[in-house]
Design a protein with these regions (language model features):
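Eukaryotic proteins' extreme N-terminal regulatory segments
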Residues: 1-22
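Intrinsic disorder
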Residues: 2-6, 85-88, 118-122, 138-145, ...
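Eukaryote-biased feature marking scaffold/signaling PDZ-domain proteins and nuclear chromatin regulators
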Residues: 7, 24-28, 89-91, 105, ...
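Short amphipathic alpha-helical interaction elements and helix-loop-helix interfaces
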Residues: 15-18, 22, 100, 104, ...
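Compact alpha/beta protein-protein interaction domains typified by the UBC
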Residues: 21-136
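Short amphipathic alpha-helical segments embedded in low-complexity Lys/Glu-rich regions
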Residues: 25-32, 111, 144, 148, ...
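Acidic, low-complexity intrinsically disordered segments
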Residues: 130-164
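Proximal pre-RING flanking segment of RING-type E3 ubiquitin ligases
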Residues: 154-213
């Protein structure tokens, strides 16, 4: 009889072709979940007066300097805070381990990370714990798809940071995050095409920028 874990992983692989199964560790897989919020997220990069890097804050909403809607950085000199609106944040890395006895006896093990660490370890631990809660609520049945789906839904609003929560990240990560946002935005832009009545064909966005007949 085929192992339930293998059946579930086969189904997950069919739904998410990008998932990577570990050839050396049976019933283990990894998937990167994109974080492309519905609305740009304002990210603050604070620095102390002496230039020292501050630790990230993941707190309820509070009053901070606002940034421009075009994604350009804004410096709040009074509070020594620089802000940027980002449309893309580094993906959430999910490592899945289905132990022997899953799903009937043991819960799946989920390990989460981001690189760079723009989400706090404390918050990632909370997300990981949600997986076991889902397994308990599902009466010890298969929940890998449901867990991935819950993370994808949370990513749509940047795990709450797209809805007013303040996201502060150390200056040491600023270049990496801005570079990621620029490259991801460019990649998404290049995938788009337009129907051109003059060229009589589809024209990629990068080229369409220079066509005055595109409206």
């Amino acid at each position: 009889m085929e192992d339930e874990r293998q059946v579930e992983l086969d189904c997950i692989s069919a739904i998410f072709p990008e998932i990577v199964l570990d050839p050396n560790e049976p019933f283990t897989a990894t998937i990167d979940l994109p974080v492309n919020p519905r609305n740009p997220v304002k990210v603050y990069f604070p620095a102390s007066a002496d230039g020292a890097i501050q630790t990230p804050l993941h707190t309820p909403p509070r009053s901070v300097a606002s940034g421009h809607e075009d994604g350009q950085g804004v410096a709040d000199h009074a509070n020594n805070v620089e802000s940027h609106n980002l449309s893309y944040l580094p993906s959430l890395q999910l490592h899945i381990i289905l132990p022997e006895g899953y799903p009937a006896t043991y819960a799946p093990k989920f390990e989460l990370a981001t690189s760079p660490a723009w989400l706090s370890r404390e918050y990632l631990d909370e997300l990981q714990a949600n997986g076991e809660c889902m397994w308990e609520e599902a009466d010890h049945s298969e929940i890998v798809f449901g867990y991935i789906d819950s993370l994808q839904q949370a990513a749509e609003n940047a795990f709450g940071y797209g809805e007013g929560k303040v996201l502060e990240i150390p200056q040491e990560y600023k270049i990496a995050l801005l570079d990621y946002d620029i490259k991801a935005t460019q990649a998404a832009f290049e995938k788009e095409t337009f129907d051109c009545g003059v060229c009589l064909g589809k024209t990629a966005c990068m080229r369409a920028l220079y066509l005055t007949n595109i409206y």
